[in-house]
UniProtKB/Swiss-Prot annotation:
One MF annotation (Gene Ontology) recorded for this entry: kinase activity
Pathway: Amino-sugar metabolism; 1,6-anhydro-N-acetylmuramate degradation; Cell wall biogenesis; peptidoglycan recycling
Annotated organism of origin: Escherichia coli O45:K1 (strain S88 / ExPEC)
Disulphide bridges: none
Protein name per the record: Anhydro-N-acetylmuramic acid kinase
Gene Ontology biological-process annotations: 1,6-anhydro-N-acetyl-beta-muramic acid catabolic process; amino sugar metabolic process; peptidoglycan turnover
Pfam families: AnmK (PF03702)
Length: 369
């Protein structure tokens, strides 16, 4: 069974950077050694945002974006190797999620698409890459998402305590770690995505630091109720979503009914939307004793306070409190999934994704010997 140093690379729906994590992984433990966040150039970020909102590209433009993202991921890996004084031979493999540009797991021809050419990463780092993690699960009737609950279960499940892990990235997703029950998990809806999109358009800021804008505003209850009427929120699990659905266009359609509102009030309402949709799903799933939050949303003081208020009797903490960096959780998960793929072990959980069976995930792009 393969063990040793692995690197995980994650560029999520929030597009706030490329997260790269170095870890030692074997069948007994996952030990994080180092991490860094690598910036995404504004031009690349905008190109991804455009395609996620349905802007048409030529095949040439799409191919260039795929190559540019692959090079970006390779640069991020090489920066971490240099920082840690490591060589390619010191790493077993890279687990690279890729950049999701479309996710449509239902319908006549279900599909998901993550780009960032893994061949570029192999060529520029000299390290074997495991990528394309989601499509095997979709081929078996699943949603291909979320995949991280399997990792949450391996690291954070407790024999007697009802726990849930909440990742608040661009999209928020919940892992249900309930003793005596199959692991559950699904996307609850928007996490930081709509908040980030709004303040970017209104103030040119990538995110609402310390929730300053949201805390200066007031929740617009009619707007909140209008957004909560979206059918996604009442869909049963398994379910997954992404930027192709919850994007700035979605927000604009709801705002048409509310002209002239204060931008800070909209920011406050979007924060409340995230908190309410998450807390409702926690309660519908039977509640928990401890809710452990990871992802960028864990640094949003307003979100954390609202979750605690909406979930009385639940201890709301970040995963940092149990020794796992919330900022690095997803990248670490894909390093772990790469290890499982090379070990020939399944990486999905049918109880989470809805797939017909467990399966080894991903495609292997081997480095030259």
């Amino acid at each position: 069974m393969k063990s040793g140093r692995f690197i995980g690379v994650m560029s999520g729906t929030s597009l706030d950077g490329v997260d790269v994590v170095l870890a030692t992984i074997d069948e007994h433990r996952v030990a994080q050694l180092a991490s860094l966040s690598w910036p995404i150039p504004v031009s690349l970020k905008q190109a991804v945002l455009d395609i996620c909102q349905g802007q048409q590209l030529t095949l040439s433009q799409f191919g260039q974006l795929d190559t540019q993202l692959g090079r970006l991921f390779a640069d991020a890996v090489n920066a971490l190797l240099k920082e840690q004084n490591l060589q390619a031979r010191d790493i077993v493999a890279i687990g690279c999620h890729g950049q999701t540009v479309w996710h449509e797991p239902t319908g006549v021809a279900p599909h998901t698409l993550q780009i960032g050419d893994n061949n570029q990463i192999v060529a520029r780092t000299g390290i074997t890459v495991v990528g394309d993690f989601r499509r095997r699960d979709i081929a078996l009737g699943g949603h291909g998402a979320p995949l991280v609950p399997a990792f949450h279960h391996a690291l954070l499940a407790h024999p007697t305590e009802r726990r849930m892990v909440l990742n608040i990235g661009g999209i928020a997703n919940l892992s249900l770690l309930i003793p005596g029950q199959p692991v559950g998990g699904y996307d609850t809806g928007p996490g930081n995505m709509l908040m980030d999109a709004w303040i970017w358009r209104q103030a040119g800021k990538p995110y609402d630091k310390d929730a300053e804008w949201a805390r200066a505003g007031k929740v617009i209850l009619p707007l909140l109720q209008n957004m909560l009427s979206d059918p996604y929120f009442s869909q049963p699990a398994p379910k997954s979503t992404g930027r192709e659905y919850f994007n700035y266009g979605w927000l604009e359609r709801h705002l048409r009914h509310f002209p002239g509102v204060d931008p800070r009030d909209v920011q406050a309402t979007l924060a409340e939307l995230t908190a309410v949709t998450i807390s409702e799903q926690v309660l519908l799933s039977g509640g928990c004793e401890r809710l452990m939050v990871c992802g960028g949303g864990g640094r949003n003081p307003l979100l954390m306070a609202r979750l605690a208020a909406l979930l009385p009797g639940t201890e709301v903490t970040t995963t940092d409190a149990v020794g796992i960096s919330g900022d690095d959780m997803e990248a670490l998960a894909f390093a772990w999934l790469a290890w499982r793929t090379l070990a020939g072990l399944p990486g999905n959980l049918p109880s989470v994704t809805g797939a017909s069976q467990e399966t080894v995930l991903g495609a292997i792009f081997p480095a030259n010997p």
